[in-house]
Amino acid sequence: YCQELRYPYYAHGMSQVLSSRGGDFTGITNGIDTKLFDPMTTEGLAAHYNEKTFKEGKLQNKLALQKTLGLPEDRDTAMLAMVTRLAGHKGIDLLCYIAERLMSRRVQLVVIGTGEEKYEWFLRGLQERFGRQVSVNLCFSADLANVVYAGADLYLMPSKSEPCGLS
């Protein structure tokens, strides 16, 4: 991302300043902060796991999350998750665009977040239409987010621009 910021298109008017920094301008990549979320020690998980036990641990957390959210408990259904602000630059409009096709597949979608009213309304409607596949949680809860990180099969982050910030 730091290389992209050297181009005017991505830099929001700051490309010259950022380019002038030369080699001391670096990027920090996204990822889960293991000080805040560690599947071996985070409280509130159905099962703790590490790189050797993750298959069984993820499955136990997934089944527990499905039960908690009122979704059918199905180990073979792909669970997609988003923990995000519901804002255009976070790519929520991309989810809106593919939602119909996505729901025609064997998937469950879990969304946690708040934001622009139009996206909240869209997600509420999606949950009404596909309630056995969709759980929309218009809030932010670090505890629920941790359970989602522990149990989801895939994490969606369709940001149009993500300056190595928060998910």
Q: Where would I find each of the regions flagged by the language model?
A:
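Catalytic cores of nucleotide-sugar-dependent glycosyltransferases that transfer UDP/GDP/TDP-activated
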Residues: 1-167
